[in-house]
Regions:
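N-terminal active-site beta-alpha-beta segment that forms phosphate/nucleotide-binding
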Residues: 2-118
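Conserved Motif II region of HX4D acyltransferases
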Residues: 122-130
Length: 130
């Protein structure tokens, strides 16, 4: 099996395991993760944070986003474009739409766009980790 094939098998297994979690287990894990991330010095020091809108069983950082907003931090979310480009967008209250695959995505025309150097901390989703 090639490395690419091994990665695909691991990815599929990770997604399957993640989706099999009971709702209460998932909620407890999300709460614990958000609390742990909020306690990190890099989170406390960051003024502008790039988060993601959870999709398909990804770790849900909504509680972390609420904490960050309460601390006056600026929250940006990624918008994927052509050729794997990524835009950091700060959406307004009515600045969301269902993007590719139904993923909650900021509407660029209603968002403040931030340059990469404005981001102090970036959270990205992953399939699985140990």
């Amino acid at each position: 099996m090639t490395l690419a094939e091994e990665k695909q098998v691991q990815r599929k297994a990770g997604i399957t395991a993640r989706r099999a979690l009971a709702p209460e287990t998932r909620a407890a894990a999300n709460a614990a993760l958000c609390a742990r991330l909020a306690a990190l010095p890099c989170f406390r020091q960051a003024r502008t944070i790039l988060l993601y809108a959870a999709f398909g069983g990804e770790a849900d950082l909504a509680t972390l986003a609420e904490t960050a907003r309460g601390l006056g931090k600026t929250l940006a979310y990624p918008v994927c474009g052509e050729n794997f480009s990524l835009t950091a967008a700060v959406p307004g209250e009515d600045g969301w739409e269902a993007g590719a695959y139904g993923i909650r995505t900021p509407i660029l025309s209603r968002a403040e766009i931030l340059p990469p150097e404005a981001l102090d901390l970036i959270f990205v989703p992953c399939t699985a980790f140990d």
